[in-house]
């Protein structure tokens, strides 16, 4: 993100990036727990709870979340926009964002959910974490005037990312956004990618790298990221 605006990341910027990655990792560790998705494998290896037990997995996730905010607090000590970024990340990954999306998923009968509900869940569970990353980069680059564009980009990217996951996982037998869309799922994804490209072209930075990265994410042939 910073590179697209021609800026090199500072040490504080790298800590923000590491903090967001810690949040992503903690969310995967907790999502894999038996009380959540119950997945035994993650990235081709046993998930944390499968390898070390549920208690260790719960504590590992908690530790990663605390580490993320320790890193963000270090950045906030610099003042300026880093305190704003810390609040942004907390909001997007909390009850009204990523965690709220997980809760909404548990409240939903996924066997009968329609496309609108599944899209809402994806926008919260995945899109909000992506928004935290994208808008943080925008703020760090000094281009907060483009924050709305990056929010739109992240929201659409989160939904498209989930749709690609669903397309790759069609054989699981679970209801999903791809399942609801049926034969039109690939065309819907193509339309989302076109929309995302158009948003990137409207930003003031060099969008070539981010367009290539987005395409790689949404054209991937594995659901492991």
What are these regions (language model features)?
Residues 1-225:
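All-alpha prenyltransferase/terpene-synthase fold signal
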């Amino acid at each position: 993100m910073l590179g697209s605006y021609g800026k090199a990341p500072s040490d504080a910027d790298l800590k923000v990036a590491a903090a967001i990655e810690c949040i992503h990792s903690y969310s995967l560790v907790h999502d894999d727990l038996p009380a959540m998705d119950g997945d035994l494998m993650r990235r081709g290896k046993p998930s944390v709870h499968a390898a070390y037990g549920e208690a260790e997995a719960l504590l590992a996730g908690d530790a990663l979340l605390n580490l993320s905010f320790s890193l963000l607090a270090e950045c906030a000590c610099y003042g300026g926009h880093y305190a704003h970024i810390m609040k942004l990340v907390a909001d997007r990954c909390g009850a009204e964002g990523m965690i709220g999306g997980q809760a909404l998923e548990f409240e939903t009968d996924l066997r009968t959910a329609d496309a609108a509900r599944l899209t809402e869940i994806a926008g919260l569970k995945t899109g909000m974490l992506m928004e935290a990353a994208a808008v943080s980069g925008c703020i760090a680059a000094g281009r907060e005037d483009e924050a709305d564009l990056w929010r739109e980009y992240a929201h659409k990217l989160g939904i498209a990312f989930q749709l690609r996951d669903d397309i790759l996982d069609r054989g699981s037998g679970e209801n999903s956004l791809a399942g609801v869309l049926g034969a039109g799922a690939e065309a819907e994804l193509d339309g989302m990618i076109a929309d995302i490209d158009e948003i990137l072209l409207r930003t003031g930075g060099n969008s070539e790298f981010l367009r290539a990265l987005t395409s790689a994410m949404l054209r991937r042939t594995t659901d492991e990221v």
